[in-house]
Amino acid sequence: MKQISATSGPTNIGLLSVGSYRPQRAVTNDELCQNIDSSDEWIYSRTGIKTRRFAARDESTASMATEAGREAIAKAGLEASDIDCVVVATSTHFLQTPACGPAVAAALGATGVPAFDISAGCAGFGYALGVAADMVRGGTAGKVLVLGSEKLSPTVDMTDRSNCFIFADGAAGVVVGETPTQGIGPTVWGSDGTQATAIRQDIDWMDYLDRPTGPRPFLRLEGSAVFRWAAFEMGKVGQQAMDAAGVRPDEIDVFLPHQANSRINEILAKSLELRPDAVIANDIEHTGNTSAASIPLAMAEVLATGAAKAGDLALLIGYGAGLSYAAQVVRLPPG
């Protein structure tokens, strides 16, 4: 019987760089409270958010991803022509087709490469990183640009005092490629569709088209349900990711959880029994919840501020709509 040939790639892979893009407009809690009965103190005490970034009308998921990707490629010392694949994690590309990935690849000058989107909510970056890592290890790509990009501000009901202050806009990403030592551990991922309504679009597009003069769709969040699930289940996922990577909690230098709520992340850090001096990313304070972009944005921030350095061992945990989750242990790239 004729054997089908297969490809294989390097065993040791890692993050070669990280790039980010934050929209210029900073929106304070006080500004949002002009439309809702709340206060800066109330919002900050429950979420850890003081300000967030909103993209301009002419900025899109694709344009923000392009800026972040351009920086990541440059920081890796590469050209766009060196990139073999572009993966964009997003839930806010406002076109049914074509996908965001090909537009980003074309804008960057990564001509002719495979490019596609992954939609896994706030866990999207972890999913995209897992796929990219397997592609490089499998030999189907040498260098993969992995991006998380979201423009959530137009999806939020600014009169909904339960969640209008949570979500924000931005993009960030990494280049994945061969490294001298292992830099990306196995992906631990999964979903629980029985809790799909906890984070959802409240009106589907077919229902909206049936009543185009009715209420428009918005993103809705059942905060208490998500809080309980994330705070008390994601610690187990983080431990599984460390076990899969052969790493102990006291060996983790940096904790990079999804930036959904600072209180959740404090609970997770405690449940994981990380070292007291381990860095816990808190980019949410000035960036808000940027869904699939939040982990790479937080990564860029801890490196840029010097809170962490290249080579540090980091635990990544993404969690959100689906409900979905993904976690990995990685070595941080140069800032």
UniProtKB/Swiss-Prot annotation:
Its EC number is 2.3.1.301. It catalyses: malonyl-[ACP] + dodecanoyl-CoA + H(+) = 3-oxotetradecanoyl-[ACP] + CO2 + CoA. NCBIfam families: fabH, PRK09352.1. Belongs to the thiolase-like superfamily. FabH family. It comes from the Bacteria. The keyword Nucleus does not apply. Pathway: Lipid metabolism; fatty acid biosynthesis; Lipid metabolism; mycolic acid biosynthesis. Gene3D superfamilies: 3.40.47.10. Pfam families: ACP_syn_III, ACP_syn_III_C. This is Mycobacterial beta-ketoacyl-[acyl-carrier-protein] synthase III. Keywords: Acyltransferase, Cytoplasm, Fatty acid biosynthesis, Fatty acid metabolism, Lipid biosynthesis, Lipid metabolism, Multifunctional enzyme, Transferase. The last Arg residue of the ACP-binding site is essential for the weak association between ACP/AcpP and FabH. InterPro entries: ACP_syn_III_C, ACP_syn_III_N, FabH, Thiolase-like. The active site is at residues 122, 258, 289.
